[in-house]
């Protein structure tokens, strides 16, 4: 299936970039965090408070497993990579793109981790959360886009060029 699945840390621009990219290539757009909130009837922050990190990861994995569109850009939550089954599903239904950004830039973009509804797995800083996840992002990525110092439009153009040059998207 010709979907594009965006993974990366909170604040890496998955949702913002996803909407712009979907418009540019004529695809639909899904934000999996919004699907999770809709299913649970509460914010991500509240879901984490209620179920803890492990419970949230299970909810996220279940919701992500249920996503099965065609010609869609899917922005995942930053913790989606903790759900092995869902990540394998995403690899089956599309191309997984890791939006890579160093912790220093992420910290500037993020603000409060708690208010953002970020699964921390006991980690307290952006650097610690990044270190906990970076190998999983690399493991599941078909394409890695380094966003360091780039504007949104630059990243969209770079990803667009990669996508239109892939045989499966022609």
What is each stretch, according to the model?
Residues 6:
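Hydrophobic anchor at the beta1->P-loop junction of P-loop NTPases
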Residues 9:
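P-loop (Walker A) phosphate-binding loop of NTP-binding proteins
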Residues 12:
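ATP-binding Walker
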Residues 15:
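Walker A/P-loop
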Residues 20, 24, 134-170:
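NTP-dependent small-molecule kinase module
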Residues 23-32, 42:
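Post-Walker A helix-loop "phosphate-sensing" segment adjacent to the P-loop in P-loop NTPases
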Residues 34-80, 84-89:
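ATP-dependent small-molecule kinase phosphotransfer cores
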Residues 93-135:
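A glycine- and Lys/Arg-enriched "phosphate-lid" helix/loop adjacent to the NTP-binding pocket
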């Amino acid at each position: 299936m010709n979907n594009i699945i965006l993974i990366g840390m909170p604040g890496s621009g998955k949702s913002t970039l996803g909407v712009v990219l979907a418009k540019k290539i004529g695809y639909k757009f899904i934000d999996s965090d919004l699907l999770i909130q809709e299913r649970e009837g509460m914010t991500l922050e509240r879901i984490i408070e209620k179920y803890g990190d492990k419970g949230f990861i299970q909810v996220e994995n279940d919701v992500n497993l249920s996503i099965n569109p065609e010609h869609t850009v899917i922005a995942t939550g930053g913790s989606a990579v903790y759900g092995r089954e869902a990540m394998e599903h995403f690899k089956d239904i599309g191309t997984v793109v890791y939006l890579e950004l160093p912790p220093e830039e992420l910290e500037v973009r993020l603000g409060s981790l708690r208010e953002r509804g970020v699964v921390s797995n006991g980690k307290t800083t952006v650097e610690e959360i990044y270190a906990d996840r970076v190998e999983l992002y690399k493991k599941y990525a078909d394409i890695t886009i380094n966003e360091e110092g780039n504007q949104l439009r630059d990243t969209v153009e770079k990803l667009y060029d990669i996508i239109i040059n892939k045989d499966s998207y022609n």
